[in-house]
Each structure stands twice: as C-alpha cells, then as structure tokens.
Regions:
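General beta-strand structural signal in soluble alpha/beta enzymes
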Residues: 67-71, 87, 96, 180-183, ...
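An extended, acidic
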Residues: 8, 61, 146-264
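Buried hydrophobic positions in well-ordered alpha/beta secondary-structure cores of metabolic enzymes
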Residues: 48, 92-93, 192, 219
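N-terminal subdomain of lithium-sensitive/metallo-dependent phosphomonoesterases centered on the IMPase/IPPase/PAP
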Residues: 1-90
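DPxDG-like acidic metal-binding loop motif
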Residues: 81-134, 152-153
Length: 264
C-alpha cells in the first residue's frame, strides 16, 4: 500500500486537477445538473462526477489502495495491494453548485483496520488539512490544535439539526454565542481541529463514512474528540447508505455537549 506521503502527493495533484476542471462550471446550472443517481441513492451532480472520475483515474494509475468507497460510485477496485480509500469528491456540493467558495475534496486512507491518513482540501481556496495516525494534524504544513474554550457563551459551533431536535436542544438549556452551518461537514470538522470552531454537532443521522473519514482522523490527531452526540463511540460501516449522528469537539467542551445530549 502507498505511504502516507505518497498518498498526500497524489491527493495534491488530484486536487489541483479537480479545482482546474471545476472552475468554469462552479456556480453554473451546467455544473449543478443532476446526471445520475449515486450509490448512496441521491442525485449526482455533474461536478461531483467530474471530480470523482479524476480521483479514480489517478488512484488507479498510482495503485494507491486496493479499493475505494465513494458516495457516487460505491465500492470500486483500484488495483493496489491493500487498503481502502474513503472519498467525497466534492464535500459541499450545494455550495459548489451555487458558487459559494466552501467545498472540498475529502479522502481518508485506511489500512483495512483503521484510518491511517486523512486529506481535506478546500477546492476554492487551496487550504489543505492533513493528518497521519500518530503524527498530528496540519493545515498547509503547520501543526494545528483545537481551541480550549469550555463555555457555551464564548463558543462558536456548527449545528445540523431538524426543527424538533433543535427545539429539544433549546428547551434543555443549549446556548452558544454563535451557531454556524457552513454546508461542508469535512471542512467544518477541520475547523474544529484548528480552533476556528469549538464543536461540530450533526443530529440528522445522514453523515456517512465517505463524508467524515478523513476529517475525523484530522480532528482526533489535532487533539479533539469525536463521538456519538451522547458521548459513546461513533462507528461508521462501509456503507454509503448508512448515516450516523456525530459530535466532534475540543476536549474542554465535548463532555458538556454530550451531557446535554443525554437529556434529550
């Protein structure tokens, strides 16, 4: 299986090619056109398919791993001798489709038992988050850590919840200085990893392993905690149709959010 450094080099090359290919069609009806139904049973937009095809071609050329799981193509053979990659070719497809510059290539690499490398690049800005298991997390090569804020009153959090869930949160005392919902979960988890947000909470039950694999490793390697909203282990199956609820937060505030969630 490819080394983490080799994996990052391929991802860098792929990300540059994707950004160039998408640039003329981001924010256009052509790029946003739904052209097929993906393996996750949701519509695939043209820009997703273009990005996925670029990744598949490059990963096969470099034999990055044995298999790759993508929400568009499902599980496909790559040709390497070991390992599984988890791909979201355009995390934040809606943002890309309407021209909001917050969408990313997200790729996690597993040795078959655990994630060993994660790569998330904002395709609009080029900012790149990476992590290697046991080696820390980085943005554009600089080490990152979560914030140490522990009070809801001073924290900024990304929260995805339907009206009944949000109502229950508020009725049980949830407050936050700022709530953000930016539309690209991998990038938002990375924002927790580098201290721009204190927490990411998704209660919809729709987040899949392809959405989160890379960013979870990045957040954990940075020093944050990822769990179910109530604090238990969050385990994703290799199934693009199976979603989970998730809490990713700095260590100081994670327990407080999990305690609140157990009241719901």
């Amino acid at each position: 299986m490819i080394t983490p450094d080799g994996f990052f080099r391929v991802c860098d090359s792929v990300a540059e090619e994707i950004a160039e290919a998408l640039r003329p069609i981001v924010g256009t009806p052509y790029g946003a056109e739904e052209i097929c139904i993906g393996a996750d049973n949701t519509p695939t937009e043209r820009l997703d398919k273009i990005a996925e095809d670029i990744v598949l071609a490059a990963f096969r050329e470099h034999a990055v791993c044995a298999r790759l799981l993508s929400e568009e193509a499902g599980m496909v053979d790559i040709g390497g001798d070991a390992g599984i990659a988890y791909l979201d070719p355009v995390d934040g497809s809606f943002n890309a489709s309407v021209g909001i510059p917050f969408y990313a290539l997200s790729v996690g690499l597993s040795d078959g038992t655990q994630m060993i490398a994660g790569y998330v690049r904002n395709l609009a800005t080029g900012e790149t988050f990476t992590a290697v298991r046991g080696g820390g997390a980085f943005v554009d090569g600089c080490p990152i850590r979560p914030s140490e804020k522990e009070s809801f009153s001073t924290s900024a959090m990304s929260v995805y919840a339907r009206p009944p869930e949000m109502r229950a949160l508020l009725e049980n005392g949830y407050t936050s200085r700022r709530i953000r919902k930016l539309g690209a979960s991998a990038l938002e988890l990375c924002y927790v990893a580098c201290g721009r947000l204190e927490a990411f909470l998704d209660l919809r039950g729709t987040l899949r392993i392809t959405d989160a694999a890379a960013a979870i490793l990045i957040l954990e390697e940075a020093g944050g905690i990822v769990s179910l909203p109530t604090g238990g282990p969050c385990i994703f199956p290799d199934d693009v149709c199976a979603g989970r609820c998730i809490l990713g937060a700095n260590k100081a505030i994670h327990g407080k959010i999990a305690s609140l969630m157990r009241l719901l």
